[in-house]
């Protein structure tokens, strides 16, 4: 499963670890992804999304029905 938020589109970034001596070694910064089930009242079923914590805040703000409608509008299967 890819490490991409279904709501925000956040994906891993690349950067450097920096030691005390300022040596640089490559590393990945991973998004804080969570598998979360949401209840859709109008469909009477649960939907499981792999979303970042920022995506959870967006769902709290807009509502799950609006976010699911946006996902379906851009062609994502939910």
Curated annotation (Swiss-Prot):
Coiled coil: none annotated. The keyword Kinase does not apply. GO terms for biological process: translation. GO terms for cellular component: cytosolic large ribosomal subunit. It comes from the Bacteria. One of its GO terms (molecular function) is structural constituent of ribosome. Residues 1-21 are annotated as: Disordered. The keyword Metal-binding does not apply. Keywords: Ribonucleoprotein, Ribosomal protein. Pfam families: Ribosomal_L28 (PF00830). Belongs to the bacterial ribosomal protein bL28 family. PANTHER family: 39S RIBOSOMAL PROTEIN L28, MITOCHONDRIAL, LARGE RIBOSOMAL SUBUNIT PROTEIN BL28M. NCBIfam families: L28. This is Large ribosomal subunit protein bL28. It comes from Shewanella halifaxensis (strain HAW-EB4). The gene is rpmB.
